[in-house]
Amino acid sequence: MENKYTHGVLFYHEHSGLKNINQGIGEVTTALSSICKHLSIQLSENEGDIIKYCQEIKTKNYAKDVDILFILGGDGTVNELINGVMSHDLQLPIGILPGGTFNDFTKTLNIAPNHKQASEQMISAQVGTYDVIKINNQYALNFVGLGLIVQNAENVQDGSKDIFGKLSYIGSTVKTLLNPTQFNYQLSIDDKTYSGETTMILTANGPFIGGSRIPLTDLSPQDGELNTFIFNEQSFSILNDIFKKRDSMNWNEITQGIEHIPGKKISLTTDPAMKVDIDGEISLETPIDIEVIPNAIQLLTVNDL
């Protein structure tokens, strides 16, 4: 087989979510080495290491011939690589190999949830171009959320049960599971303003959150637009069939309790200040400015058969 790439770098973290990370590395390198003449395996020991390595790759201090990046890990590890690539303007394709609890964006890329199968898919995967979310000075592939979604993430981090489980964030009758915190918000989306009281606001780039698909048929991470959802009712027992697919044109007509607003530039303030979940990482508080950066990143994508 002809090598597609000259020098690939595989990033991984010891706490990737795999039970045996060293075994996992061995399982994925068989396929990856078949498409790269040279494959470097790079451990990320501390948070921020991957961003530092991206800077070294940009300045050619890491190596002069790197032409593809791979990441084995969960959404948090992937998020760090996205931030490294975006902040250092690395115009390199990325292959994502699932290795954590949730890999929401790999579903969008049609990548198998098993890391070994995913590595084999990289052999024939094609490069696709995707939008990225910019939040203040950080970047994300998939979503930005606050309110109930943060409460859930903190539950999971504390080792408590994930109340959403495999249910959609937009489908759970969460009032019976958790007492959501109400907060006041002021939201500007493409110069239109919205305000009120809510328990959750979610801005999505990708169609999968928490392992399930948002039932909005035209939501795409390749359309140069973000989709913001405001949960207006305290109890989200909102639909005859929450999983019934709908598009942007009729969402607000048939979906009670969740307002959908598409847009490109978003400013959000809250009272009180609220923690913000960015692709599963809680690292900011409101106020925040959000914008879409179209066609910003190259990701290996498996053709949907």
Curated annotation (Swiss-Prot):
Its cofactor is Mg(2+). Residues 3-139 form the DAGKc domain. Keywords: ATP-binding, Kinase, Lipid biosynthesis, Lipid metabolism, Magnesium, Metal-binding, Nucleotide-binding, Phospholipid biosynthesis, Phospholipid metabolism, Transferase. InterPro entries: ATP-NAD_kinase_N, Diacylglycerol/lipid_kinase, Diacylglycerol_kinase_cat_dom, Lipid_Phosphate_FormReg, NAD/diacylglycerol_kinase_sf, YegS/DAGK_C. Binds 1 Mg(2+) ion per subunit. This ion appears to have a structural role and is required for catalytic activity. The active site is at residue 281. ATP binds at residues 44, 74-80, 101. One of its GO terms (molecular function) is ATP-dependent diacylglycerol kinase activity. The keyword Lipoprotein does not apply. Transmembrane segments: none annotated. GO terms for biological process: phospholipid biosynthetic process. The keyword Transferase applies. Its EC number is 2.7.1.-. Mg(2+) binds at residues 220, 223, 225. SUPFAM superfamilies: NAD kinase/diacylglycerol kinase-like. One of its GO terms (cellular component) is plasma membrane. May catalyze the ATP-dependent phosphorylation of lipids other than diacylglycerol (DAG). Belongs to the diacylglycerol/lipid kinase family. This is Putative lipid kinase SaurJH9_0749. The lineage of its organism: Bacteria, Bacillati, Bacillota, Bacilli, Bacillales.
